[in-house]
């Protein structure tokens, strides 16, 4: 199937469901506790990421689509952290705050990329009045091309049938990531996306492909669905529709590091593609490609348009160009096996100008390969203000990747690339400007690993800020 990426900016999607905050505590472990036979983790890094329905909304926003999110939260620090994280990535939150319940939070403790324990903080939202959710759906329906209902059985979708009927009345497709074995409650939905174990919990164990298809088609008929997409892990996914032959899409995953949130990516990309005008078959193809990308990342993750474009064109393993962190680590390892010296620099690179090009060319001359780490849009706004960046992340990375001096381009979400630099550990870390070497983010980690840190001069009188001001003066 030949599929091109749609213009996701035309797509509006509303996600309704169980939102939660995923917390990750990372650190080394080198001893066993004297209190009990358990490892002691010295926590040195803490991350917070939106999870559940919130991760679906993030996946939609990461494609450039208009992403709206409705869910239930408490009135607490977790709710504030969740809202803040989502606002950073342009998700429009419209939460219903419930003062008697805490925001659902899941805490994972990890060491050496291994999850040691997960702690859940939740009470569920059973018994909460669904009317405020109905009202939010009704208000959003005229502005969206798809409704996603993300069910984690925490209470936000207890009245899911009413939500389905609201969408059907407005002729908006409703896509559901189901939970549990009672699919009757999803009757009349446009599409269900159960994984294989969820599917077999309803129809029984399928001995072969023929049984899976026949039982799936019966389920479609019994519950008046327009379609059913069964995600099957390493076996890919299968789309079933009345009157059409089954469509099987083999997995595109190269390596599997973590399946956390992969189902969220599937339904998020699928909904965004549908809302942008793709057919259901094309949308499933894109969702399958996105799943192959996201399982190669650690933790709850999203996929960018460039990663998706690379996946559908088979460029994810080419070894050069725009990459995610896992792909970059593999490329760097291969470069070192060839005895190549790896140089790394970073910046926003909002409006690429002659000063940038000269600086990057000089940085490249200091080694064999040049990595350029680029601030995300959210990071740029925090550093430069709400009117920046002028050019979105994907466009900035494409332009950088086209330069002869640049081998690899990788994005980062934080204000500084210190974590990324510590993970990659380049042979030479380069920064432009009037910094002192010990002021450069990541310098301590590079020195500790035996690497070098160097400061290069920028070309005088040329800057993105000056260019923007000149444009404003000209327009004025």
From Swiss-Prot:
Reactions the enzyme catalyzes: D-glycero-beta-D-manno-heptose 7-phosphate + ATP = D-glycero-beta-D-manno-heptose 1,7-bisphosphate + ADP + H(+); D-glycero-beta-D-manno-heptose 1-phosphate + ATP + H(+) = ADP-D-glycero-beta-D-manno-heptose + diphosphate
PROSITE patterns linked to this entry: PFKB_KINASES_1 (PS00583)
UniProt GO MF annotations: ATP binding; heptose 7-phosphate kinase activity; heptose-1-phosphate adenylyltransferase activity; phosphotransferase activity, alcohol group as acceptor
Region spans: Ribokinase: 1-318
Active site residues per record: 264
Keywords recorded for this protein, A-Z: ATP-binding, Carbohydrate metabolism, Kinase, Multifunctional enzyme, Nucleotide-binding, Nucleotidyltransferase, Transferase
InterPro entries: Bifunc_HldE (IPR023030), Carboh/pur_kinase_PfkB_CS (IPR002173), Cyt_trans-like (IPR004821), PfkB_dom (IPR011611), RfaE_dom_I (IPR011913), RfaE_dom_II (IPR011914), Ribokinase-like (IPR029056), Rossmann-like_a/b/a_fold (IPR014729)
EC identifiers of the protein: 2.7.1.167, 2.7.7.70
Pfam families listed in its UniProt record: CTP_transf_like (PF01467), PfkB (PF00294)
Protein name according to UniProt: Bifunctional protein HldE
Annotated organism of origin: Yersinia enterocolitica serotype O:8 / biotype 1B (strain NCTC 13174 / 8081)
